[in-house]
Each structure stands twice: as structure tokens, then as C-alpha cells.
């Protein structure tokens, strides 16, 4: 279990210490579950009333909240960001693998940097290049001539097809597949003729990809994921998609082929985005958005009907289904009124 003096933690977090710096911090916890040795954080003033009941040894908070502190405190401008950084310092997550497992199959032509770990039953094919401190979890497959940059980690059962490039300090969760064939077919009088997918997937640095996500290889050009992109679980990213730096994609999103998304975008969960078009920088699509046309202006975009009581929704749906008839009737009434005038 990691531990650190509160004063040392404050220094690493560039926080202002109030209280005993010799307190030993052993973990991060919520305000409700924290006990002695824990540090917690408060991001909303409405939780001030809970400080009196909180058992944490220290609390991260803003200057405005400091008068309400009942324990040692670290004062910062952004408690949530500080929480993320202190959680990294006190992280107890094990590595996906340690050392080279005896059952790992590593081709003689593969190149491994220093301090590489490969888990049980993983397969590393010919021509693969693994940078320093790369960790390959149990049961992973890394296809021919693929490259994985220094410090990147693959959890168990990740599949990386041939000729894929993954940058430095990336994290890929279990059962994700990178570089499978895109959905490319030509129609010959009702019969589907497969188009070999000859492109690659290029993933930048500091990219994180959730579990059970699929990113298809390009048909001719490459599928490209920019630096700092974060992608949640169970997303489908089709061939030739390009995602700009630092864009966030929530769970269950489906992106059709040849879509280009700009930088600093946020795509809400279960959204569906049409292909062969562009979305500009700094666009937010709220959950379950259906994006059928290009977006050329930054901003927040929504579609769909929010949840309603069933009876209300049925009435709304009935009105929508009859909107064409209502429009025709309204136009007829307008013509009659105009004639009377």
C-alpha cells in the first residue's frame, strides 16, 4: 500500500497546506467512506455540511471552503483536477503483467525495449517493435510489424492487428480490437464483393481506450486517433475515421467511415455519427445525439426526445406521426383566411 506524508503530497500537488504536514496519507476515498489515513476532496460548496462528519485525515478544497474545514486541508484552485493527480500518486492498480511469462510467444524478429513485460499466453508476431517499459497483458495478440511506443500498456486479451502504430504512454483496456477490417464491400448484382482493407490504424501519444472498443483499419488511407484522445467502452470507430487531439468519446458511440472530428470535441454516450463529413474543433454532442450533417461552428448540439412519462411520450409520438397532415390542414386554413380577407 502506498503512503506519503501530507506535506510531501502538498508539495507534489502544488497545494497550500493547512494543518499537520506529518500526517501519513495511505489512500484516496470519498467523503462518505473516508477514514483515518485517507484524503478526500470537495468540489461543490453544497457538501460543506458533510465536513463535520467526514473522517478523512485531510480534505482537498478551495480557499472559499477552508473556513469550514474540520481536519487538515490542501487548498487548491481546482479540487477535481487535484483529485485526479493525487489518485495517480496513490494508485494501487496492478500492472497488466510483470516480466516475460514463460508461456508468452515472442517471434525472434520482434524488438523489445528495456523493462518490457509480456503476460501469459500473449503472442508477439514478427517485426513487432515494443518500446521501453511497454506492458502487454495476458492473452494479448500483437500482429506483424506493429509498433507500440514507450510506456504504453495493454490489459488482458487486447488484439492489435498487423501494421498498427500506437504511440507512447497509451492505455488500452481488455478485449479491445485495433485494426480489424473496415466494413468495405462492393455490390455485384446483389452479391457482396469484399474490398481488402489496406490502410492502418495510427494512434498518437497519451491515448486511452476503454474495454471492448473496436477501431477499424483504413481501406486505403489510415484511421487516425490523435494525441490525448480518450475513448470509452464499446465504441465502434469505422475505417478512415480521423479524431483530433484531446477529443473525448463516451461509451457506445458509433462513428461511420471517413468521418473527421476536430480537436477538443466531446461526444456523448450512444451517439451515432454519419460518415464522409467533418465536425469542427470544440464541438460537444450530447448523449444519444444523431449527427447526420457536418458541424462547422463550435458549440453544444443535441437531438432526440428526452425521457417522459409513457403517456406523455405516446401523445407526443402520435402528434409527430400526424404532423404532415396537420401541416396540410394549417396551410388550407391559411388559404381560406387569406381568401376571406
Swiss-Prot record:
Presence of the UniProt keyword Transferase in the record: yes
Protein family per UniProt: Belongs to the transferase hexapeptide repeat family. LpxD subfamily.
Protein name: UDP-3-O-(3-hydroxymyristoyl)glucosamine N-acyltransferase
Keywords for the protein's UniProt record, in alphabetical order: Acyltransferase, Lipid A biosynthesis, Lipid biosynthesis, Lipid metabolism, Repeat, Transferase
Catalytic activity: a UDP-3-O-[(3R)-3-hydroxyacyl]-alpha-D-glucosamine + a (3R)-hydroxyacyl-[ACP] = a UDP-2-N,3-O-bis[(3R)-3-hydroxyacyl]-alpha-D-glucosamine + holo-[ACP] + H(+); UDP-3-O-[(3R)-3-hydroxytetradecanoyl]-alpha-D-glucosamine + (3R)-hydroxytetradecanoyl-[ACP] = UDP-2-N,3-O-bis[(3R)-3-hydroxytetradecanoyl]-alpha-D-glucosamine + holo-[ACP] + H(+)
GO molecular function list: N-acyltransferase activity; UDP-3-O-(R-3-hydroxymyristoyl)-glucosamine N-acyltransferase activity
Domain of life where this protein originates: Bacteria
UniProt pathway annotation: Glycolipid biosynthesis; lipid IV(A) biosynthesis; lipid IV(A) from (3R)-3-hydroxytetradecanoyl-[acyl-carrier-protein] and UDP-N-acetyl-alpha-D-glucosamine: step 3/6
HAMAP family for the chain: LpxD
Gene Ontology cellular-component terms listed: membrane
Enzyme Commission code: 2.3.1.191
Natural source organism: Salmonella choleraesuis (strain SC-B67)
Amino acid at each position: 500500500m502506498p503512503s506519503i506524508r501530507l506535506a510531501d503530497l502538498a508539495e507534489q500537488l502544488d497545494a497550500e497546506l493547512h494543518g499537520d504536514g506529518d500526517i501519513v496519507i495511505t489512500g484516496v476515498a470519498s467523503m462518505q467512506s473516508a477514514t483515518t489515513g485517507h484524503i478526500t476532496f470537495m468540489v461543490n460548496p453544497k457538501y460543506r455540511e458533510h465536513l463535520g462528519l467526514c473522517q478523512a485525515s485531510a480534505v482537498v478544497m478551495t480557499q472559499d471552503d477552508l473556513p469550514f474545514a474540520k481536519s487538515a486541508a490542501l487548498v487548491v484552485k481546482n479540487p477535481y483536477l487535484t483529485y485526479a493527480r493525487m489518485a495517480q500518486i496513490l494508485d494501487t492498480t496492478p500492472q497488466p503483467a510483470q516480466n516475460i511469462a514463460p508461456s508468452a510467444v515472442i517471434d525472434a524478429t520482434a524488438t523489445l525495449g528495456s523493462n518490457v513485460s509480456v503476460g501469459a499466453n500473449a503472442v508477439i508476431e514478427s517485426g513487432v517493435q515494443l518500446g521501453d517499459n511497454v506492458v502487454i497483458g495476458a492473452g494479448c495478440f500483437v500482429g506483424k510489424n506493429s509498433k507500440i511506443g514507450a510506456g504504453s500498456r495493454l490489459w488482458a486479451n487486447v488484439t492489435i492487428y498487423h501494421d498498427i502504430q500506437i504511440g507512447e504512454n497509451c492505455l488500452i483496456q481488455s478485449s479491445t480490437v485495433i485494426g480489424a477490417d473496415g466494413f468495405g464491400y462492393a455490390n455485384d448484382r446483389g452479391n457482396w464483393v469484399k474490398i481488402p482493407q489496406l490502410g492502418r490504424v495510427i494512434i498518437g501519444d497519451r491515448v486511452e481506450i476503454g474495454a471492448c472498443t473496436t477501431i477499424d483499419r483504413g481501406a486505403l488511407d489510415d484511421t487516425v486517433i490523435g494525441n490525448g484522445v480518450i475513448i470509452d467502452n464499446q465504441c465502434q470507430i469505422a475505417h478512415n475515421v480521423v479524431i483530433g487531439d484531446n477529443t473525448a468519446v463516451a461509451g457506445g458511440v458509433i462513428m461511420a467511415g471517413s468521418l473527421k472530428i476536430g480537436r477538443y470535441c466531446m461526444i456523448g454516450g450512444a451517439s451515432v455519427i454519419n460518415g464522409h463529413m467533418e465536425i469542427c474543433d470544440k464541438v460537444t454532442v450530447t448523449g444519444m445525439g444523431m449527427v447526420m450533417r457536418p458541424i462547422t461552428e463550435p458549440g453544444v448540439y443535441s437531438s432526440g426526445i428526452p425521457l417522459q412519462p409513457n403517456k406523455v411520450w405516446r401523445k407526443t409520438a402520435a402528434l409527430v406521426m400526424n404532423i404532415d397532415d396537420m401541416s396540410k390542414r394549417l396551410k388550407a386554413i391559411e388559404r381560406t383566411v387569406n381568401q376571406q380577407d
